[in-house]
Regions:
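Generic structural "secondary-structure junction" signal
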Residues: 47, 54, 59, 106, ...
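Conserved hydrophobic/aromatic beta-strand scaffold that supports enzyme active sites
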Residues: 21, 36, 49, 156-158, ...
Length: 233
């Protein structure tokens, strides 16, 4: 009988947390600019790496997203793998994280109700803008490998940077944030595979200028036995 003192429990796998990220492109259809920032060197997740604005879904996102307008085709694509309530929360988290990490508001002239006033609501109201959630297209999904201690189930959205006014600023999450040509970002910056994956998917749609399509399959990046898998869902 083995000595119990020698038995070692296998580490518990981290459950991937829901997260949202926005690929903001602007300008040229062939070689647009993309918004990227470098994660702090002391960050727990992907330190020193250039990424899009984004982060995990908060509990409050569910309440704030309850009545937001969402394109039918975007909702249809998200609902293939998550319930409607979570799909809406992901979209709200996407615009919230973009503002928190860059200072940019994905919006257009309009009003927003201050009654449930989060900091994001107040930022929109002060700028005379309303959230432009209809401007987001769901383009890709990536799940952090199972062996990682910190994992995310991230949905990537594409938005036009021309619809994201505001003054860029460094935050506690992202440093050296700014607009860069996609070609330069790919060749010169330290990008993770997942960032390159989402950027390539965004660039395809940006160049095609394809109309909304609820039947379009969405690329998903995941791993199995440490082998990267790219599938359509």
């Amino acid at each position: 009988m083995p000595d119990r003192r020698t038995l070692v429990k296998a580490p518990r796998r981290a459950h991937p947390r829901d997260a949202a990220s926005v690929v903001l492109l602007r300008g040229s259809r062939t070689d647009p600019e993309v918004l990227l920032g470098r994660r702090r060197l002391d960050a727990r997740f992907m330190p020193g790496i250039y990424v899009f604005p984004g982060g995990r879904v908060d509990r409050a996102d569910y309440a704030h997203a309850a009545d937001i307008p969402v394109r039918d085709d975007v909702l249809a694509k998200l609902e293939r793998h998550c319930p409607t309530r979570r799909a809406r929360a992901l979209i709200w988290a996407a615009i919230r994280e973009t503002w928190e990490e860059s200072g940019l508001l994905i919006g257009r002239p309009g009003t927003i109700d201050r009654v449930n006033g989060s900091d994001l609501h107040r930022a929109y109201a002060d700028a005379g803008l309303a959230p432009y959630t209809e401007g987001l297209d769901y383009i890709a999904r990536a799940i952090t490998p199972a062996h990682n201690p910190i994992r995310f189930n991230t949905r990537f959205f594409l938005a036009d940077g021309a619809q994201a006014p505001g003054a860029l600023h460094h935050t506690s999450e992202l440093e050296d944030i700014g607009w860069r040509r996609v070609s330069e970002a790919i060749s010169d910056l330290d990008l993770m595979n997942v960032t390159r994956f989402a950027l390539v998917e965004a660039l395809k749609l940006w160049r095609d200028g394809a109309p909304p399509d609820p039947n379009r399959r969405v690329a998903r990046l995941s791993t199995r036995m440490r082998t990267k898998l790219l599938t359509l869902e």
